[in-house]
């Protein structure tokens, strides 16, 4: 049964860093990513171009109307906390508009952090599965390496995404 398959997480707060906090971000997802109107976004938009509803402060001008406007892409999108990691840890107090020379790298780093957060989410889910005790030290090691990539831009640059994917798949 499902109840027998899962156990309590080692630390219930480990998932906290995977919770989006748009108020602590600068709307990077609304700029860095490609949007398609057919997928429930307000417009067809190329990656690197700001959404037409993104305000200067990084917040959405129509956030309170997303449901009414049936913008399911916006409603369902979850960066798993990548936005706030980039804006608070890797590029603190850096608004992409104020630093056009860093814009491309910042957007690229956002995508990389998002992918690392996805790996992190799956690894944390594995720690809650019964029968994974033999793999716990490998899981913990990989989780710590991913978290250390978020210390600064240099650490993220040195983190091999393909290596992390490969190691996570082996576990």
Predicted feature descriptions by range:
Residues 2-171:
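Short loop/turn segments that flank or connect secondary-structure elements
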